[in-house]
């Protein structure tokens, strides 16, 4: 075996000089015990000296496998890669939680027109109509209230006695006595009747407001609002599209950053 060593060395030297080099003389066999005598990346045989001063013939695949074993046995310590991956996981969770919240949010119920809603009380209808159609309701209410008060005052002037009626409905005796003994009984009588007729006055005001609103809309003085259901659907679709676009952009950015981090880590491993 020993007399073949010089011949083998000379052959390897010729092959090393004639063939192109891709990895240099000292490449992937740094973890093999013993000094490296000669190594070529394209050659299939590597000649090394063992710990007992014996010449060993190793293939390039074995050399690379011995190099990779210690790298696999000792993974890289947690550093920039794990830190960035942690940030990416947190951002993914935020995006998915925001999308889940947007999808889980129930749609707002369609609010009916207070002028046509019979499911609520008269006073609530009056308040909602005042908020939505205040510019129309206020003039109508003032006109109808004036008509109501004028009617009651005229009735009091004509000698209509409302005291028995007030006693019948159960008003306090203090109020009834004021109406009996007051010199200005006509005004107080008209006011008492005005307050008693409050439900009827509110009903007439709402009816007058409804008729006025229809008239103004038919002649183009008021814009007809779009249906609430269609409006809410359009808004929900727009919000959903915006959230989807933001999720895709965030996902692409995180994928690019993760790929760059992997490339950097693999490059560091190759350098080591």
Swiss-Prot record:
Pfam families: FAM210A-B_dom (PF06916). Residues 229-271 form a coiled coil. The chain crosses the membrane at residues 136-156. Residues 117-229 form the DUF1279 domain. It is found in: Membrane; Mitochondrion; Cytoplasm. One of its GO terms (cellular component) is cytoplasm. Signal peptide: none annotated. Changing residue 140 to E: In a breast cancer sample; somatic mutation. Gene3D superfamilies: 6.10.140.1430. Interacts with ATAD3A. PANTHER family: PROTEIN FAM210A, PROTEIN FAM210B, MITOCHONDRIAL. Belongs to the FAM210 family. This is Protein FAM210A. It comes from Homo sapiens (Human).
């Amino acid at each position: 075996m020993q007399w073949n060593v010089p011949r083998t060395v000379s052959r390897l030297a010729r092959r090393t000089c004639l063939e192109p080099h891709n990895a240099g003389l000292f490449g992937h066999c740094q973890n093999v015990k013993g000094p490296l005598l000669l190594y070529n990346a394209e050659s299939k045989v590597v000649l090394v000296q063992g710990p007992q001063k014996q010449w060993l013939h190793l293939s390039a695949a074995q050399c690379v496998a011995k190099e990779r074993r210690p790298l696999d046995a000792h993974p890289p310590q947690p550093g920039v890669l794990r830190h960035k991956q942690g940030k990416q996981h947190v951002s993914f969770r935020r995006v998915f939680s925001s999308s889940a919240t947007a999808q889980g949010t129930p749609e707002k119920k369609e609010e009916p027109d207070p002028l046509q809603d019979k499911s609520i009380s008269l006073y609530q209808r009056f308040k909602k109509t005042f908020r939505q159609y205040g510019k129309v309701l206020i003039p109508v209410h003032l006109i109808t209230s004036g008509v109501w008060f004028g009617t009651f005052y005229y009735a009091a002037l004509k000698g209509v006695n409302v005291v028995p009626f007030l006693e019948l409905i159960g008003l306090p005796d203090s109020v009834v006595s004021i109406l009996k003994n007051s010199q200005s009984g006509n005004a107080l009588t008209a006011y008492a009747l005005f307050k008693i007729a409050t439900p009827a006055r509110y009903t007439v005001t709402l009816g007058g407001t409804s008729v006025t609103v229809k008239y103004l809309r038919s002649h183009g003085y008021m814009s007809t609002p779009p249906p609430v259901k269609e409006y809410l659907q359009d808004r929900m679709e727009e919000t959903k599209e915006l959230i989807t676009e933001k999720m895709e952009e965030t996902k692409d950015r995180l994928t690019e950053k993760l790929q760059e981090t992997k490339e950097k880590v693999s490059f560091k491993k190759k350098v080591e």
